[in-house]
Amino acid sequence: MPDSSINSDSGFKHLSVMADAVSQPVAALPAELLDGGLMIDATLGGGGHSALLLERHPDLRLIGLDQDPTARAAAAERLALFGDRVKIVATNFVDFSPAEPAVVVMADLGVSSPQLDVAKRGFSFRLDGPLDMRMNPQVGETAAELIGRLEETELADLIYAYGEERLSRRIARRIKHDLAEQGPYAGTAALAYAVAGCYPPKARRGRIHPATRTFQALRIAVNDELDALDRFLQKAPDWLVPGGLLAVISFHSLEDRRVKTAFLRDQRLERLTRKPLVASEMEIAANPRSRSAKCRFARRLPQAMTADAL
């Protein structure tokens, strides 16, 4: 079995979350689907989930999607041994349409360890770097540009809606005051310090950093993550053959609620998990970032069973 961690010359090192949990329902698919079938990894990252499934199912083919050039380079290196069974596409999943239906479509919605741990990507409040946060560093507005553009009330609403941050108005007021008085923040550490200062002293020493929710909100906004997820959940069932499997790993309640609702209400799908699967204690001990992961599965119904055919 391949190791799901990535250690490559690209510097992309990542431990895939819930890899075994994803592999089990894939293994339960009928052999006729897996024989020469296509798998679409909509968030390829370093290729850990895909490598595991390609290893276990030698007749499976892969199309891997990712907008992050660093991730694509790492995945290409990691998956090279699978040869022409693998195709990597530089795209956001919302802009993709497959030429043929797939037997498996999966998406891991989390920010990868390399994105969090490389300061220059600007995702981390623990490592000082530019206030960027773009998944695709060549496209779109940075977090610094976003907080500079928004009015205080707009920024507060964004932090509350996307970060579920109860101190959103206090934080937005502090950010806009700092920008007006001092100019742009020097980097992520300065913003994290400002956000932490909005909390009472005792609340700054908890397990969760005070800036966590604000940084989550800015990252979601910069990358339009929730709208992209909604569009993916609308499109993905049509990428599947009847009986095909849709697997989504989410990392916060805003994502999980959308996945749960889509799997429950979409008449093209049969929900396979009433409650999401979560990481085992052993996995959490080995990879603490798996603590918040939730995995849900659905099966594509035969066309005759969908509402359109009734």
Curated annotation (Swiss-Prot):
Ranges in coiled-coil conformation: none
InterPro entries: RsmH, SAM-dep_MeTrfase_MraW_recog, SAM-dependent_MTases_sf
Gene3D superfamilies per the UniProt record, alphabetical: Putative methyltransferase TM0872, insert domain, Vaccinia Virus protein VP39
Residues engaged in binding S-adenosyl-L-methionine: 47-49, 66, 93, 108, 115
Regions crossing the membrane: none
GO biological process: one example: rRNA base methylation
Primary residence: cytoplasm
Entry annotated with the keyword DNA damage: no
Catalysis performed (reactions): cytidine(1402) in 16S rRNA + S-adenosyl-L-methionine = N(4)-methylcytidine(1402) in 16S rRNA + S-adenosyl-L-homocysteine + H(+)
Record GO terms (molecular function): rRNA (cytosine-N4-)-methyltransferase activity
Cellular component per GO, a single term: cytoplasm
The keyword Membrane belongs to this UniProt entry's keyword annotation: no
Subcellular location: Cytoplasm
Entry keyword set: Cytoplasm, Methyltransferase, rRNA processing, S-adenosyl-L-methionine, Transferase
Enzyme Commission (EC) number: 2.1.1.199
SUPFAM superfamilies, sorted: Putative methyltransferase TM0872, insert domain (SSF81799), S-adenosyl-L-methionine-dependent methyltransferases (SSF53335)
Top-tier EC class: transferase
Family assignment from sequence similarity: Belongs to the methyltransferase superfamily. RsmH family.
Record-linked NCBIfam families: 16S rRNA (cytosine(1402)-N(4))-methyltransferase RsmH (TIGR00006)
Function: Specifically methylates the N4 position of cytidine in position 1402 (C1402) of 16S rRNA.
HAMAP family: 16SrRNA_methyltr_H
UniProt protein name: Ribosomal RNA small subunit methyltransferase H
